[in-house]
From Swiss-Prot:
This is Small ribosomal subunit protein bS16c. It comes from the Eukaryota. The keyword NADP does not apply. It is found in: Plastid, Chloroplast. Keywords: Chloroplast, Plastid, Ribonucleoprotein, Ribosomal protein. One of its GO terms (molecular function) is structural constituent of ribosome. InterPro entries: Ribosomal_bS16 (IPR000307), Ribosomal_bS16_dom_sf (IPR023803). One of its GO terms (cellular component) is chloroplast. The gene is rps16. It comes from Guillardia theta. Pfam families: Ribosomal_S16.
Length: 76
């Protein structure tokens, strides 16, 4: 099953996250199928490719609870 989830990157104490599509059984920092945007909680900066997210959601990709909350703030 594919999931829409956050992949951590950045420095210690200054984490940033990429919004990616990946299998639910993969590790957090594993290989992603597609990158759809990023989220930086330190600067509250967010960039999401809304069209690709809607396409992936229509294909049956399930977002994690954190991603769902993020999408509710940004998109809907």
């Amino acid at each position: 099953m594919l999931k829409l989830r956050l992949k951590k990157y950045g420095r210690k104490g200054q984490a940033s996250y990429r919004l990616v599509v990946m299998p639910s059984t993969s590790k957090r920092d594993g290989r992603a199928i597609e990158e759809l945007g990023f989220y930086n909680p330190c600067t509250n900066e967010t960039h999401i490719n809304v069209e690709r997210v809607k396409v992936r959601l229509s294909q049956g990709v399930k977002p994690t609870s954190t991603v769902k909350n993020l999408l509710d703030k940004v998109i809907f």
